[in-house]
């Protein structure tokens, strides 16, 4: 009846497997009588059912029957007597104990093994490199040889026991085949996780080192694995350090706009650096122009707003915008200036060196700075174009660029060509020479260049002076303006304005004073003439050089000479009638004769004005 219920639950798909298993179990009795073949049949039975989760135990420790197995047999054999059931549990040689993984269907098997084959234990290993060496042994079913001496059971009891065993095996097959696919997928998933796990290789190494469970690897393979691990660790560390450095550089560039990561400018050529610098300078000029345009537009907008609102009304609104935009433009300017400085350093123009030179060097001029820059550019050109001096031409003296720099300094300080210690140090640094070489060059230059030039200049000056002495007619003999403007207290004008100041002088002294005061010798004519030569009274006449056409004398000023009694040279107004100062007016017209008294009043002041 239980067998009919079992077949009611199974489908047509498992009928073939059931027939095969029935045939195998029916041949079980034959294998018991032939002990040499029972091992082969046992492998066939439990090899086909190894995936069903069956565990078969042949240990000698299980001589005592399990109570669950006895209860199960008691449930299926209720019609049998107590004596028959006990005889089945104790004396049956073909019964088997079958224990499922889930402990659902326990059964009894023979608890004795053949004496000629010892039992083997269970060996586990996590190694995946050499699975054949893992000593995991499958359980085998080895029924005990029938002891024909003490066996007295009948055929019916054996047939019932065989049917019972067959029924349990088929039920186990049907139960585990339904879940076969799910278990297979779950097993593959866990196998993939174990294979790809990073703990697999350390576990294998530990097992091979301490347990030696079938993992046989050569020392070379172990060393290769360790070397690969070290390389991976180094690569990971390098990646971490580079990642952290990139993050730090990004933070620094975000905080400060002027600081930036300088590109490898040394790999660029000289012409590319020049183009880069020119482009950056043009961008800086464009930035300044746009910033000025923005400020102009803001000023216009603020003026329009203030015209509508009032003075100071736009400052509240434009201050924030102006501050933000000025910050933006300043950041851009700092970035461009940083790029220009980096490019200039790549070109060899070191601003720090130039600044130190400008502070220390007292005689440096813009011309020398330009010369230094030109020499640096020429040097870079030579380095790029590989234009070197010919090896077969020996170098005589100092290098040409050094001599050019020293000569330029000499001409800049021509009046005092004696460099100080600081100047020598700077020139030695610029030219690449030593201080002794710079000093020796200046000593030789002062003798060979500077001294001949000074002597030539002195010779030219002396030659011009000799030409002036030998040819006086070629020289302009006009008096100097200072000599004409000079006014002394002993001059004629002072005597006329102050007639009593010089009353005590004699005639000789008066005559010499007049001659010394009015020096008209430069005009080429005799300025002072005595009236005694042309007139009976001997008056003094002063000819001013205004000649008439007929060759006679011009305008003359007649002064009465001093009397023998020591009288005065000039008389007062009360004595004018006795000895007046007479003016000859040979060149005066009739109209001018009428104005003669006014001229008499003016006296010598007119003469001073004419002069």
UniProtKB/Swiss-Prot annotation:
Expressed in both floral and vegetative tissues. InterPro entries: HD, Homeodomain-like_sf, KN_HD, POX_dom, TALE_homeobox. It comes from the Eukaryota. It is found in: Nucleus. Residues 118-133, 174-183 have a biased composition (Low complexity). Residues 63-87, 101-133, 141-160, 174-195, 225-263 are annotated as: Disordered. Residues 197-213 are annotated as: SR/KY domain. A motif (Bipartite nuclear localization) lies at residues 275-290. Residues 269-340 are annotated as: BELL domain. Keywords: DNA-binding, Homeobox, Nucleus, Transcription, Transcription regulation. One of its GO terms (cellular component) is nucleus. Residues 391-453 bind DNA. Residues 234-251 have a biased composition (Basic and acidic residues). One of its GO terms (molecular function) is DNA binding. Pfam families: Homeobox_KN (PF05920), POX (PF07526). May form heterodimeric complexes with TALE/KNOX proteins STM, KNAT1/BP, KNAT2 and KNAT5. Interacts with AG-SEP1 and AG-SEP3 dimers. Interacts with KNATM, isoform KNATM-B. Interacts with BZIP30. Belongs to the TALE/BELL homeobox family. The SR/KY and BELL domains are responsive for the interaction between the TALE/BELL proteins and the TALE/KNOX proteins. Plays a major role in ovule patterning and in determination of integument identity via its interaction with MADS-box factors. Formation of complex with AG-SEP dimers negatively regulates the carpel identity process and favors the maintenance of ovule identity. BEL1-STM complex maintains the indeterminacy of the inflorescence meristem. Required, with SPL, for cytokinin-induced PIN1 expression in ovules. This is Homeobox protein BEL1 homolog. The lineage of its organism: Eukaryota, Viridiplantae, Streptophyta, Embryophyta, Tracheophyta.
């Amino acid at each position: 009846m239980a067998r009919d219920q079992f077949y009611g639950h199974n489908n047509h798909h498992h009928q073939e497997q059931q027939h095969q298993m029935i045939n195998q179990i029916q041949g079980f009795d034959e294998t018991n009588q032939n002990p040499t073949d029972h091992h082969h049949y046992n492998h066939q039975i439990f090899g086909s059912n190894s995936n069903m989760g069956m565990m078969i135990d042949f240990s000698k420790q299980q001589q005592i029957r399990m109570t669950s197995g006895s209860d199960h047999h008691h449930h299926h054999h209720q019609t049998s007597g107590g004596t028959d059931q006990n005889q089945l549990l104790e004396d049956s040689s073909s019964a088997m104990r079958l224990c499922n993984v889930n402990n659902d269907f326990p059964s009894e098997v023979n608890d004795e093994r053949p004496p000629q084959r010892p039992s083997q234990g269970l060996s586990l290993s996590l190694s995946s490199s050499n699975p054949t060496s893992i000593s995991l042994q499958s359980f085998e079913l080895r029924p005990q040889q029938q002891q024909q001496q003490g066996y007295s059971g009948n055929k019916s009891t054996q047939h019932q026991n065989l049917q019972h065993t067959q029924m349990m095996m088929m039920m186990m097959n049907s139960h585990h085949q339904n879940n076969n696919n799910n278990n297979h997928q779950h097993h593959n998933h866990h196998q993939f996780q174990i294979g790809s796990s990073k703990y697999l290789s350390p576990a294998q190494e530990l097992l091979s080192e301490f347990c030696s469970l079938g993992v046989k690897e050569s020392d070379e393979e172990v060393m290769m694995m360790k070397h690969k691990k070290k390389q991976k660790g180094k690569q990971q560390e390098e990646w971490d350090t580079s990642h952290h450095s990139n993050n730090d550089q990004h933070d620094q560039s975000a905080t400060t706009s002027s600081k930036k990561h300088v590109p490898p400018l040394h790999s660029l050529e000289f012409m590319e650096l020049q183009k880069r610098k020119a482009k950056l300078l043009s961008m800086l000029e464009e930035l300044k122009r746009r910033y000025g345009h923005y400020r102009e537009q803001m000023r216009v907008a603020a003026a329009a707003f203030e015209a509508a609102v009032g003075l100071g009304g736009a400052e509240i609104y434009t201050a924030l915008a102006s501050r933000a935009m000025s910050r933006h433009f300043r950041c851009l300017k700092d970035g461009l200036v940083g790029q220009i400085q980096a490019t200039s350093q790549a070109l060899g123009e070191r601003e720090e060196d130039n600044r130190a030179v400008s502070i220390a060097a007292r005689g440096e001029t813009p011309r020398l700075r330009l010369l230094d820059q030109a020499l640096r550019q020429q040097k870079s050109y030579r380095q790029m174009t590989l234009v070197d001096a010919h090896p077969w031409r020996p170098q005589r003296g100092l290098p040409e660029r050094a001599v050019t720099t020293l000569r330029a300094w000499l001409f800049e300080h021509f009046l005092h060509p004696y460099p100080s210690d600081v100047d020598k140090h700077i020139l030695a640094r610029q030219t690449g020479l030593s201080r002794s070489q710079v000093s020796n060059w200046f000593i030789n230059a002062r003798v060979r260049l500077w001294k001949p030039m000074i002597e030539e200049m002195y010779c030219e000056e002396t030659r011009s002076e000799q030409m002036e002495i030998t040819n006086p007619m070629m020289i302009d003999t006009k008096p100097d303006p200072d000599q004409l403007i000079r006014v002394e207290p002993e001059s004629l004008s002072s005597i006329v304005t102050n007639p009593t100041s010089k009353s005590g002088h004699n005639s000789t002294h008066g005559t010499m004073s007049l001659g010394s005061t009015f020096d008209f010798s430069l005009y080429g004519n005799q300025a002072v003439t005595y009236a005694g030569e042309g007139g009976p009274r001997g008056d003094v006449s002063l000819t001013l050089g205004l000649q008439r056409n007929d060759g006679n004398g011009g305008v003359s000023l007649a002064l009465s000479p001093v009397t023998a009694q020591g009288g005065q040279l000039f008389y007062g107004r009360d004595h004018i009638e006795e000895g007046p100062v007479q003016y000859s007016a040979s060149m005066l017209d009739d109209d001018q004769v009428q104005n003669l008294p006014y001229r008499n009043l003016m006296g010598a002041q007119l003469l001073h004005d004419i002069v």
